[in-house]
Protein backbone atom coordinates (compact mmCIF):
# COMPACT_ATOMS: atom_id res chain seq x y z
CA UNK A 1 0.00 0.00 0.00
CA UNK A 2 1.40 3.37 -1.01
CA UNK A 3 2.27 5.87 1.72
CA UNK A 4 2.04 8.71 -0.76
CA UNK A 5 -1.07 10.93 -0.67
CA UNK A 6 -3.69 10.06 -3.32
CA UNK A 7 -4.10 12.33 -6.34
CA UNK A 8 -6.37 12.12 -9.36
CA UNK A 9 -5.00 13.62 -12.57
CA UNK A 10 -7.64 14.39 -15.17
CA UNK A 11 -5.80 14.14 -18.45
CA UNK A 12 -7.48 16.03 -21.28
CA UNK A 13 -7.86 14.52 -24.72
CA UNK A 14 -7.37 15.96 -27.28
CA UNK A 15 -4.32 17.88 -26.10
CA UNK A 16 -0.93 18.89 -27.44
CA UNK A 17 0.19 18.88 -31.04
CA UNK A 18 -2.41 19.52 -33.72
CA UNK A 19 -2.02 18.40 -37.33
CA UNK A 20 -0.67 21.80 -38.41
CA UNK A 21 2.05 21.81 -35.74
CA UNK A 22 2.99 18.20 -36.51
CA UNK A 23 3.31 19.08 -40.19
CA UNK A 24 5.45 22.18 -39.54
CA UNK A 25 7.93 20.28 -37.35
CA UNK A 26 8.07 17.45 -39.87
CA UNK A 27 8.88 19.94 -42.65
CA UNK A 28 11.94 21.22 -40.76
CA UNK A 29 13.14 17.70 -39.92
CA UNK A 30 12.63 16.41 -43.46
CA UNK A 31 14.38 19.46 -44.91
CA UNK A 32 17.37 18.78 -42.64
CA UNK A 33 17.42 15.14 -43.76
CA UNK A 34 17.18 16.00 -47.46
CA UNK A 35 19.28 19.16 -47.74
CA UNK A 36 21.52 19.03 -44.67
CA UNK A 37 22.21 21.76 -42.12
CA UNK A 38 21.72 24.60 -41.87
CA UNK A 39 18.04 24.91 -42.61
CA UNK A 40 16.82 28.41 -41.81
CA UNK A 41 13.44 29.00 -40.21
CA UNK A 42 11.78 32.40 -40.23
CA UNK A 43 10.35 32.97 -36.73
CA UNK A 44 9.82 30.13 -34.24
CA UNK A 45 8.36 27.26 -36.27
CA UNK A 46 5.78 26.90 -33.49
CA UNK A 47 5.59 28.81 -30.22
CA UNK A 48 7.41 26.36 -27.95
CA UNK A 49 10.99 26.75 -26.74
CA UNK A 50 11.49 23.02 -26.18
CA UNK A 51 10.61 22.31 -29.81
CA UNK A 52 12.72 25.19 -31.11
CA UNK A 53 15.77 24.14 -29.08
CA UNK A 54 15.35 20.52 -30.20
CA UNK A 55 15.38 21.60 -33.83
CA UNK A 56 18.35 23.90 -33.25
CA UNK A 57 20.29 20.90 -31.94
CA UNK A 58 19.54 19.15 -35.23
CA UNK A 59 20.81 22.03 -37.37
CA UNK A 60 17.91 24.46 -37.75
CA UNK A 61 18.77 28.16 -37.51
CA UNK A 62 15.99 30.53 -36.48
CA UNK A 63 15.84 34.10 -37.78
CA UNK A 64 13.19 36.80 -37.56
CA UNK A 65 13.90 38.33 -40.97
CA UNK A 66 15.26 36.96 -44.24
CA UNK A 67 18.02 39.61 -44.21
CA UNK A 68 19.62 37.68 -41.33
CA UNK A 69 20.46 34.72 -43.58
CA UNK A 70 24.15 34.98 -44.57
CA UNK A 71 24.69 35.37 -48.29
CA UNK A 72 26.85 32.24 -48.38
CA UNK A 73 23.88 30.18 -47.09
CA UNK A 74 21.20 31.58 -49.38
CA UNK A 75 21.23 28.35 -51.35
CA UNK A 76 19.96 26.52 -48.26
CA UNK A 77 16.22 26.16 -47.69
CA UNK A 78 14.30 28.57 -45.48
CA UNK A 79 11.08 27.45 -43.82
CA UNK A 80 8.19 29.81 -43.06
CA UNK A 81 6.56 29.13 -39.69
CA UNK A 82 3.18 27.49 -39.08
CA UNK A 83 1.64 30.88 -38.26
CA UNK A 84 1.86 32.11 -41.85
CA UNK A 85 3.61 35.15 -43.30
CA UNK A 86 2.58 38.32 -45.16
CA UNK A 87 2.82 38.17 -48.95
CA UNK A 88 5.75 40.57 -48.73
CA UNK A 89 7.89 37.86 -47.10
CA UNK A 90 7.49 35.33 -49.92
CA UNK A 91 7.99 38.15 -52.43
CA UNK A 92 11.23 39.10 -50.69
CA UNK A 93 12.34 35.45 -50.68
CA UNK A 94 11.81 35.32 -54.44
CA UNK A 95 13.70 38.59 -54.86
CA UNK A 96 16.65 37.09 -52.96
CA UNK A 97 16.31 33.91 -55.03
CA UNK A 98 15.81 31.88 -51.85
CA UNK A 99 14.47 28.33 -51.87
CA UNK A 100 11.65 28.46 -49.35
CA UNK A 101 9.33 25.85 -47.90
CA UNK A 102 6.03 27.17 -46.59
CA UNK A 103 5.00 25.46 -43.34
CA UNK A 104 1.93 27.64 -42.86
CA UNK A 105 -0.84 25.56 -41.32
CA UNK A 106 -3.34 24.71 -44.08
CA UNK A 107 -6.15 26.02 -41.88
CA UNK A 108 -4.37 29.38 -41.57
CA UNK A 109 -3.89 29.39 -45.35
CA UNK A 110 -7.65 28.85 -45.64
CA UNK A 111 -8.23 32.02 -43.56
CA UNK A 112 -5.92 33.90 -45.95
CA UNK A 113 -8.00 32.71 -48.90
CA UNK A 114 -11.23 33.68 -47.16
CA UNK A 115 -9.93 37.21 -46.54
CA UNK A 116 -8.91 37.52 -50.20
CA UNK A 117 -12.33 36.21 -51.26
CA UNK A 118 -14.07 38.87 -49.16
CA UNK A 119 -12.02 41.58 -50.84
CA UNK A 120 -12.73 40.23 -54.32
CA UNK A 121 -16.43 40.58 -53.52
CA UNK A 122 -15.89 44.23 -52.64
CA UNK A 123 -16.02 43.78 -48.86
CA UNK A 124 -13.85 45.43 -46.25
CA UNK A 125 -12.31 42.67 -44.11
CA UNK A 126 -12.73 42.55 -40.34
CA UNK A 127 -10.13 40.32 -38.67
CA UNK A 128 -10.92 39.22 -35.12
CA UNK A 129 -7.61 38.48 -33.42
CA UNK A 130 -4.77 39.65 -31.21
CA UNK A 131 -2.54 42.52 -32.32
CA UNK A 132 1.08 41.55 -32.89
CA UNK A 133 0.49 37.80 -33.13
CA UNK A 134 2.38 36.36 -36.14
CA UNK A 135 -0.78 34.78 -37.52
CA UNK A 136 -2.59 38.13 -37.44
CA UNK A 137 0.38 39.85 -39.07
CA UNK A 138 0.38 37.18 -41.78
CA UNK A 139 -3.34 37.41 -42.44
CA UNK A 140 -3.38 41.21 -42.56
CA UNK A 141 -0.39 41.04 -44.89
CA UNK A 142 -2.35 39.15 -47.55
CA UNK A 143 -4.11 42.38 -48.54
CA UNK A 144 -2.96 45.93 -49.10
CA UNK A 145 -2.72 48.35 -46.19
CA UNK A 146 -6.12 49.62 -45.09
CA UNK A 147 -8.07 46.67 -46.49
CA UNK A 148 -8.29 44.92 -43.10
CA UNK A 149 -9.48 46.22 -39.73
CA UNK A 150 -8.37 44.34 -36.60
CA UNK A 151 -11.00 43.89 -33.88
CA UNK A 152 -9.64 42.55 -30.58
CA UNK A 153 -12.43 43.12 -28.04
CA UNK A 154 -16.16 43.62 -27.62
CA UNK A 155 -15.39 47.29 -27.01
CA UNK A 156 -13.62 47.50 -30.39
CA UNK A 157 -16.71 45.97 -31.99
CA UNK A 158 -19.02 48.46 -30.28
CA UNK A 159 -17.12 51.51 -31.47
CA UNK A 160 -16.03 50.38 -34.94
CA UNK A 161 -17.21 52.77 -37.67
CA UNK A 162 -16.80 51.32 -41.18
CA UNK A 163 -16.99 53.38 -44.34
CA UNK A 164 -19.68 51.11 -45.77
CA UNK A 165 -21.55 48.99 -43.19
CA UNK A 166 -23.22 47.02 -45.98
CA UNK A 167 -19.96 45.71 -47.47
CA UNK A 168 -18.18 43.90 -44.65
CA UNK A 169 -16.81 40.38 -44.24
CA UNK A 170 -15.03 38.82 -41.28
CA UNK A 171 -12.40 36.17 -40.59
CA UNK A 172 -10.76 35.23 -37.29
CA UNK A 173 -7.43 34.15 -35.94
CA UNK A 174 -7.51 30.35 -35.65
CA UNK A 175 -6.45 30.14 -31.98
CA UNK A 176 -9.00 32.36 -30.22
CA UNK A 177 -11.29 31.61 -27.30
CA UNK A 178 -14.55 30.31 -28.74
CA UNK A 179 -16.62 32.21 -26.14
CA UNK A 180 -14.75 35.51 -26.53
CA UNK A 181 -15.05 35.36 -30.30
CA UNK A 182 -18.77 34.60 -30.08
CA UNK A 183 -19.24 37.70 -27.91
CA UNK A 184 -17.45 39.92 -30.42
CA UNK A 185 -19.37 38.44 -33.34
CA UNK A 186 -22.68 38.90 -31.56
CA UNK A 187 -22.00 42.65 -31.33
CA UNK A 188 -20.79 42.94 -34.93
CA UNK A 189 -23.69 40.99 -36.39
CA UNK A 190 -26.26 43.03 -34.48
CA UNK A 191 -24.64 46.29 -35.58
CA UNK A 192 -24.01 45.18 -39.16
CA UNK A 193 -26.68 42.70 -40.33
CA UNK A 194 -25.07 42.50 -43.78
CA UNK A 195 -21.77 41.23 -42.31
CA UNK A 196 -20.63 38.25 -44.40
CA UNK A 197 -19.20 35.15 -42.73
CA UNK A 198 -16.29 33.16 -44.14
CA UNK A 199 -17.20 30.08 -46.17
CA UNK A 200 -16.04 27.86 -43.28
CA UNK A 201 -15.29 28.33 -39.58
CA UNK A 202 -12.03 30.23 -39.00
CA UNK A 203 -11.30 29.00 -35.45
CA UNK A 204 -9.66 25.66 -36.13
CA UNK A 205 -10.97 22.27 -35.00
CA UNK A 206 -7.95 21.71 -32.74
CA UNK A 207 -8.46 24.98 -30.85
CA UNK A 208 -12.13 24.14 -30.30
CA UNK A 209 -11.43 20.52 -29.32
CA UNK A 210 -8.78 21.45 -26.75
CA UNK A 211 -11.02 24.08 -25.21
CA UNK A 212 -13.93 21.61 -24.99
CA UNK A 213 -11.76 19.02 -23.22
CA UNK A 214 -10.57 21.65 -20.74
CA UNK A 215 -14.17 22.67 -20.04
CA UNK A 216 -15.05 19.03 -19.33
CA UNK A 217 -12.20 18.59 -16.86
CA UNK A 218 -12.24 21.98 -15.13
CA UNK A 219 -15.08 21.75 -12.61
CA UNK A 220 -13.84 20.40 -9.29
CA UNK A 221 -10.15 20.72 -10.17
CA UNK A 222 -7.97 22.07 -7.36
CA UNK A 223 -5.38 22.97 -9.99
CA UNK A 224 -5.38 23.00 -13.79
CA UNK A 225 -1.98 22.81 -15.47
CA UNK A 226 -1.67 23.88 -19.09
CA UNK A 227 1.57 22.98 -20.84
CA UNK A 228 2.65 25.73 -23.21
CA UNK A 229 4.81 28.77 -23.80
CA UNK A 230 3.87 32.27 -22.69
CA UNK A 231 3.81 33.41 -26.34
CA UNK A 232 1.43 30.61 -27.37
CA UNK A 233 -1.98 32.16 -28.00
CA UNK A 234 -3.91 28.89 -27.87
CA UNK A 235 -2.22 27.78 -24.62
CA UNK A 236 -3.03 31.09 -22.90
CA UNK A 237 -6.64 30.72 -23.99
CA UNK A 238 -6.76 27.28 -22.33
CA UNK A 239 -5.66 28.83 -19.02
CA UNK A 240 -8.52 31.32 -19.28
CA UNK A 241 -11.06 28.63 -20.22
CA UNK A 242 -10.02 26.42 -17.27
CA UNK A 243 -10.65 29.19 -14.74
CA UNK A 244 -13.85 30.31 -16.45
CA UNK A 245 -15.30 26.79 -16.27
CA UNK A 246 -14.58 25.96 -12.66
CA UNK A 247 -10.93 25.23 -11.89
CA UNK A 248 -9.86 26.78 -8.58
CA UNK A 249 -6.54 27.77 -10.12
CA UNK A 250 -5.02 27.45 -13.58
CA UNK A 251 -1.38 28.03 -14.50
CA UNK A 252 0.75 27.85 -17.62
CA UNK A 253 3.95 25.78 -17.37
CA UNK A 254 6.64 24.99 -19.93
CA UNK A 255 8.36 22.16 -18.04
CA UNK A 256 7.89 20.14 -14.84
CA UNK A 257 10.63 22.27 -13.25
CA UNK A 258 8.28 25.28 -13.46
CA UNK A 259 5.98 23.70 -10.87
CA UNK A 260 6.67 24.82 -7.29
CA UNK A 261 5.32 21.77 -5.49
CA UNK A 262 5.92 23.31 -2.05
CA UNK A 263 3.40 26.06 -2.81
CA UNK A 264 0.63 23.97 -4.33
CA UNK A 265 -1.12 23.27 -1.03
CA UNK A 266 -3.48 20.34 -0.53
CA UNK A 267 -4.50 18.67 -3.77
CA UNK A 268 -6.96 15.87 -4.44
CA UNK A 269 -7.80 16.48 -8.12
CA UNK A 270 -5.72 18.26 -10.74
CA UNK A 271 -6.31 18.52 -14.47
CA UNK A 272 -3.69 18.56 -17.20
CA UNK A 273 -3.77 19.66 -20.81
CA UNK A 274 -1.35 21.05 -23.37
CA UNK A 275 -1.54 23.74 -26.02
CA UNK A 276 -1.34 22.81 -29.69
CA UNK A 277 2.38 23.67 -29.80
CA UNK A 278 3.34 21.69 -26.68
CA UNK A 279 4.98 18.25 -27.08
CA UNK A 280 3.59 15.15 -25.41
CA UNK A 281 6.97 14.37 -23.88
CA UNK A 282 6.47 17.32 -21.49
CA UNK A 283 3.07 15.95 -20.45
CA UNK A 284 4.86 12.68 -19.59
CA UNK A 285 7.50 14.62 -17.67
CA UNK A 286 4.88 16.38 -15.54
CA UNK A 287 2.96 13.19 -14.77
CA UNK A 288 6.24 11.54 -13.72
CA UNK A 289 7.00 14.48 -11.40
CA UNK A 290 3.62 14.07 -9.69
CA UNK A 291 4.04 10.28 -9.41
CA UNK A 292 7.18 10.87 -7.33
CA UNK A 293 5.10 12.79 -4.78
CA UNK A 294 1.61 11.28 -4.99
CA UNK A 295 -0.17 7.99 -5.51
CA UNK A 296 -1.56 9.00 -8.89
CA UNK A 297 -4.74 7.79 -10.55
CA UNK A 298 -5.29 8.96 -14.14
CA UNK A 299 -8.73 9.87 -15.47
CA UNK A 300 -9.10 10.63 -19.16
CA UNK A 301 -11.33 13.59 -20.02
CA UNK A 302 -11.90 12.81 -23.68
CA UNK A 303 -14.31 14.91 -25.72
CA UNK A 304 -13.18 14.16 -29.28
CA UNK A 305 -10.92 11.88 -31.29
CA UNK A 306 -8.68 13.62 -33.83
CA UNK A 307 -7.55 11.88 -37.00
CA UNK A 308 -6.66 14.92 -39.13
CA UNK A 309 -3.29 14.84 -40.93
CA UNK A 310 -1.76 17.26 -43.42
CA UNK A 311 0.67 16.41 -46.20
CA UNK A 312 4.12 18.00 -46.14
CA UNK A 313 5.43 19.99 -49.11
CA UNK A 314 5.74 18.08 -52.36
CA UNK A 315 9.53 18.59 -52.39
CA UNK A 316 9.86 16.57 -49.16
CA UNK A 317 7.56 13.62 -49.84
CA UNK A 318 10.40 11.42 -51.06
CA UNK A 319 12.08 11.56 -47.62
CA UNK A 320 11.15 8.94 -45.03
CA UNK A 321 10.19 10.25 -41.59
CA UNK A 322 11.02 7.71 -38.87
CA UNK A 323 9.71 7.49 -35.28
CA UNK A 324 13.24 8.32 -34.14
CA UNK A 325 13.09 11.61 -36.04
CA UNK A 326 10.17 12.71 -33.85
CA UNK A 327 11.33 11.04 -30.62
CA UNK A 328 12.44 14.34 -29.08
CA UNK A 329 8.81 15.51 -28.92
CA UNK A 330 6.87 12.22 -28.72
CA UNK A 331 5.58 10.92 -25.39
CA UNK A 332 4.33 7.61 -24.11
CA UNK A 333 0.77 8.51 -23.15
CA UNK A 334 -0.58 10.09 -26.33
CA UNK A 335 -4.06 8.72 -25.72
CA UNK A 336 -3.70 8.69 -21.95
CA UNK A 337 -5.10 5.15 -21.82
CA UNK A 338 -2.67 3.33 -19.54
CA UNK A 339 -3.48 0.42 -17.24
CA UNK A 340 -4.36 2.78 -14.36
CA UNK A 341 -6.42 5.12 -16.53
CA UNK A 342 -10.16 5.57 -16.03
CA UNK A 343 -12.53 7.43 -18.32
CA UNK A 344 -14.03 10.60 -16.85
CA UNK A 345 -17.76 10.67 -17.56
CA UNK A 346 -18.47 13.63 -19.85
CA UNK A 347 -21.98 14.96 -19.36
CA UNK A 348 -23.97 15.46 -22.55
CA UNK A 349 -24.85 19.10 -23.21
UniProtKB/Swiss-Prot annotation:
GO molecular function, one term: 4 iron, 4 sulfur cluster binding
Residues annotated as catalytic: 135 (proton donor)
The keyword Iron is assigned to this record: yes
UniProt-listed Enzyme Commission number(s): 1.17.7.4
Function comment: Catalyzes the conversion of 1-hydroxy-2-methyl-2-(E)-butenyl 4-diphosphate (HMBPP) into a mixture of isopentenyl diphosphate (IPP) and dimethylallyl diphosphate (DMAPP). Acts in the terminal step of the DOXP/MEP pathway for isoprenoid precursor biosynthesis.
Stored NCBIfam families: ispH_lytB, PRK01045.1-4
Coiled coil: none
Binding-site positions, (2E)-4-hydroxy-3-methylbut-2-enyl diphosphate: 47, 83, 133, 174, 232-234, 277
GO biological process, one term: terpenoid biosynthetic process
Pathway of action: Isoprenoid biosynthesis; dimethylallyl diphosphate biosynthesis; dimethylallyl diphosphate from (2E)-4-hydroxy-3-methylbutenyl diphosphate: step 1/1; Isoprenoid biosynthesis; isopentenyl diphosphate biosynthesis via DXP pathway; isopentenyl diphosphate from 1-deoxy-D-xylulose 5-phosphate: step 6/6
Co-factor: note: Binds 1 [4Fe-4S] cluster per subunit.
Record-given protein name: 4-hydroxy-3-methylbut-2-enyl diphosphate reductase
Cofactor(s) named in the record: [4Fe-4S] cluster
Positions annotated to bind [4Fe-4S] cluster: 18, 105, 204
One Pfam family of this chain: LYTB
Binding-site residues for dimethylallyl diphosphate, renumbered to this chain: 47, 83, 133, 232-234, 277
Protein family according to the UniProt entry: Belongs to the IspH family.
Catalytic activity: isopentenyl diphosphate + 2 oxidized [2Fe-2S]-[ferredoxin] + H2O = (2E)-4-hydroxy-3-methylbut-2-enyl diphosphate + 2 reduced [2Fe-2S]-[ferredoxin] + 2 H(+); dimethylallyl diphosphate + 2 oxidized [2Fe-2S]-[ferredoxin] + H2O = (2E)-4-hydroxy-3-methylbut-2-enyl diphosphate + 2 reduced [2Fe-2S]-[ferredoxin] + 2 H(+)
Keywords noted in UniProt: 4Fe-4S, Iron, Iron-sulfur, Isoprene biosynthesis, Metal-binding, Oxidoreductase
InterPro entries listed in its UniProt record: LytB/IspH
Residues involved in isopentenyl diphosphate binding: 47, 83, 133, 232-234, 277
